[in-house]
Amino acid sequence: MVTAIVAILVLVVLFAVIVAIAKDPGPQPEDVAVAYEVAWDKLDFESLYTLAGSELRDGLDRHQFIVAKKAAYAEQRALSGLADRVGVDDSATAGNAAIVATRVELHDGGVVCNRVDLARRNGRWEVVGYRLAPTDAGGPPPGS
């Protein structure tokens, strides 16, 4: 009798854990966009590949992508570690699409604003577009 009760309790707990995991939405578009910016700042090509959709992987598999990016940036180490702070200025989500306007504050006092386009695929957000956004002189970033 006690064994049956313990077995039922274990099954109930297991079911509750599975439901909780299934309902977890994972990182939100804003989190993924900030992680993508930070990965670029660190020239962390492994993370960039993981966060990017096929649109930004240059048709390469993971290994090829990382090797190609490391080769392309081998002499550009000065481009890493420039960000002092990365944040989100604005975001909009509609269904399985999102646009996030990021703001990268640089150590030298400069600011770079980017537009990060994301798509929700297989239960997770992927970066599918990434471009420089207009700054103060050009008006608000697209999608804001």
What role is predicted for each listed range?
Residues 1-42:
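Short, low-complexity N-terminal intrinsically disordered segments enriched in polar/charged residues
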Residues 25-28, 37-41, 57-61, 92, ...:
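Extracytoplasmic/periplasmic, Sec-exported soluble proteins
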Residues 36, 48, 65, 118:
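Hydrophobic pocket/interface hotspot
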Residues 43-58:
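Short, well-ordered alpha-helical segments enriched in acidic and aromatic residues
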Residues 58-71:
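Short, charge-rich amphipathic alpha-helical segments embedded
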Residues 68-97:
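A short, amphipathic edge element
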Residues 86-144:
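Exposed beta-sheet edge and beta->alpha loop/turn motif
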